[in-house]
Curated annotation (Swiss-Prot):
Protein name: Peptide chain release factor 1
Subcellular location: Cytoplasm
Keyword Disulfide bond assigned: no
Gene Ontology CC: one annotated term: cytoplasm
Length: 359
């Protein structure tokens, strides 16, 4: 394992001390918020660095005691027993520091544009898409985030053919970004009289909410159509052309929005989704090139990749990217144990990043 960058750690400690000193002086409310936010980000790393250096000093003292031929034999034996435990703790802290120093995804703190679509499996796929969306809703609530549905198309038997929502909360993209891909369910539908297990699927897309400065969209690249909103069966549900369809000509990405009676609101929502999809498409292209080079299992962003299976008869959830199986299906679907999968995927991704640094 590579040595820690001591000079960089010294700079971080100095920055932390300088920020704390600024708080003791006169500071306006806007600057105060910036300082406290940066301190909150630095605190875990600074605590780990201080603990690491303290343990390292203790190991040095013990080494001196063990090497001293005049030291008490009983004390030397006790020191040798403590030495192994301290070295293990030192290694744990060093790894914690390495992970904290990994490059941060600039989008990790962004809100999320979440899209869940029914795949193969007919009505059962729509029901499963509904289950997945509610799982994310409950998980978001546990994180203290909010979820706002932007557009929804309900399935004939319930659930959703497609649902698009905005998940708002600090770190939403960091925790949800590995959920993109094909989710498969194996269960006996309520309408199945023979007790046969059916397999169906739904596709999840998790995209960071991007701003105009993040993605440049030229007006000439857009084809905008307006129309009257339609309900189930295709009938018009209002007399004004409030529905809007925006096509991004260079990429062929199309966004249709009709949930609001206001064309202005539909257009704003459609542009938000379009920006996220354009950004996401470019990231998928870059990620595919990177993962092809590094053979990464997690983070490839491939929407066609089957990432997880929910087997109801066996009560298990298996994430195929990291070969992790949890026999906690009810808790996962309830959003309570989804965090275990999220944490495992994050740890695996961080391990891949550390390995890449060592290449």
């Amino acid at each position: 394992m590579s040595r820690l960058p001591e000079t960089k750690l010294d700079i971080l400690l100095a920055r932390h001390a300088a920020l704390e000193a600024q708080l003791l002086g006169p500071v306006n409310s806007e600057h105060y918020v910036k300082i406290t936010r940066e301190l909150a980000e630095l605190n875990p790393l600074v605590d780990a660095v201080k603990a690491y250096r303290q343990v390292r000093d203790e190991i040095g003292d013990i080494d001196s005691l063990i090497a001293d031929p005049d030291s008490d034999p009983e004390l030397r034996a006790m020191a040798q027993a403590e030495h192994a435990a301290l070295e293990e703790h030192e290694a744990e802290l060093a790894q914690q520091i390495r992970i904290a120093l990994l490059p941060k995804d600039a989008m990790d703190d962004r809100n999320v544009m979440l899209e869940v679509r029914a795949g193969t499996g007919g009505d059962e796929a729509s029901l499963f898409a509904g289950d997945l969306f509610r799982m994310y809703e409950k998980f978001a609530a546990l994180q203290g985030w909010s979820v706002e549905v932007i557009s929804a198309s309900e399935g004939a038997a319930g659930g959703f053919k497609e649902i698009i929502a905005e998940v708002k909360g600090r770190g939403a993209f960091a925790k949800l970004k590995f959920e993109s891909g094909v989710h498969r369910v194996q269960r006996v539908p309520d309408t199945e009289t023979q007790g046969r297990i059916h397999t169906s699927a739904a596709t999840v897309a998790v995209m960071p909410e991007v701003e105009e400065v993040d993605v440049e969209i030229k007006q000439d690249d857009l084809k905008i159509d307006t129309m009257r909103a339609q309900g189930a069966g295709g009938q018009h549900v209002n007399k004004t052309e409030s529905a809007i369809r925006i096509t991004h000509l260079p990429t062929g990405i199309v966004v249709m929005m009709q949930d609001s009676r206001s064309q202005h609101k539909n257009r704003a929502s459609a542009m938000n989704i379009l920006r996220s999809r354009i950004y996401d498409a470019e990231q998928q292209r870059l990620d595919a090139a990177r993962s092809a080079e590094r053979k990464e299992k997690v983070g490839s962003g491939d929407r066609s990749e089957r990432i997880r299976t929910y087997n109801f008869p066996q009560g298990r959830v298996t994430d195929h990217r990291i070969n992790l199986t949890l026999y906690k299906l009810p808790q996962v679907i309830a959003g309570e144990a989804l965090g275990e999968l999220v944490d495992a995927l994050t740890t695996d991704y961080q391990a891949a990043q550390l390995a890449a640094q060592g290449d």
